[in-house]
């Protein structure tokens, strides 16, 4: 038995990069690859992807099979305006919904989109929580 959390995270990053069709592709990366705090190119949006949780459930006889449920957060940031972050959010949701079935995974689901604009000044932020399910990684 192994963990599926980083496999799911890498799949999400590569999927967003390869299937982006709405204008210029944002800077998409895992959160630990972002080297600076507080600095962002105000002309290009940023999407940070990070793992939140992995739960492992037993199913099958005698614990022979395991279902891994991995929660991933996709955090979109923009300095443009509300319309721009709304378009970025719609593109993220479009990509995830178009890829419900992923190779190597049971499925990929949108759990909850959350606006966090009220916490910041001069920056728009939206978080989409997604869930991967995989058996016996």
Where are these regions (language model features)?
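Short secondary-structure boundary micro-motifs
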Residues: 32, 66-68, 115
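Oligomerization/assembly interface segments of phage tail-like spikes and tubes
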Residues: 64-80, 124-136
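Acidic-leaning, charged glycine-interspersed low-complexity segments
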Residues: 18, 22-25, 35, 42-46, ...
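Short, low-complexity, polar/charged sequence segments that are solvent-exposed and flexible
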Residues: 50-52, 66-71, 91-95, 130
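Short capping loops/turns at secondary-structure boundaries
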Residues: 5, 85, 119-123
């Amino acid at each position: 038995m192994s963990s599926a959390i980083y496999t799911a995270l890498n799949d999400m990053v590569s999927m967003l990069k390869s299937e982006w069709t709405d204008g210029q592709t944002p800077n998409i990366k895992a959160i630990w690859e972002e080297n600076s705090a507080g600095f962002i190119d105000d002309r290009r949006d940023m999407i940070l992807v990070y793992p939140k949780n992995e739960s492992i459930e037993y199913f099958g006889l005698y614990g022979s099979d395991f279902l891994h449920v991995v929660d991933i957060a996709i955090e979109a940031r923009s300095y443009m305006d509300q319309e721009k972050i709304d378009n970025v959010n719609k593109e993220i949701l479009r990509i995830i919904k178009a890829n419900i079935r992923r190779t190597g995974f049971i499925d990929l689901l949108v759990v909850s989109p959350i606006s966090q604009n009220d916490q910041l000044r001069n920056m728009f932020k939206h978080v989409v929580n997604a869930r991967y399910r995989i058996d016996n990684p």
